[in-house]
Amino acid sequence: MKKPVRAAIVGALGLAAAGASNAADVVRYPLLGGSTFPIARAVEVPAGKTIIFHSGTTPAPLDPKAEQGTAAYWGDTKTQALSTFARIKESLDTMKLDFGNVAAMTVYLVGDPAKGGRMDFEGFMAAYTQFFGTKEQPNLPARSTVQVAGLVAPGMLVEIEVQLVK
């Protein structure tokens, strides 16, 4: 008699835990001080969710016929960021995910020679805000953006790495 009761209790607790896990949602904490900058201060992933680590993605050449390593070949930071986001979207589509699943993002920007060697943060943000913090896709990731000395190809200015939750 004790075994059936114990099994029923364990089964009920398991179902309750599964229901709670499915009902739990990712929590995105806004920046403090009423900031409207389009990133999350933090993203909390509840138990039972799957975390996916997506490799860094770089842009496709803007003009493959141009001289490799030039701005004509790759484009500026905004152009490269738009291309990179398009390539990430293409990858996410094959995984049945979208930008709303992005919980964290690390952005690597090379200093743009046309900007005196400084990263073009404004150009990057012009691309980023087309995909995040929009009416259609309001979910904001926790994000870090850093300037790096270089990426895998001369003239490449953008690489983006994302972590996703489903």
Predicted segments — roles?
Residues 4-86, 90-103, 112-166:
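N-terminal presequence-like segments and the immediate start of the first folded domain
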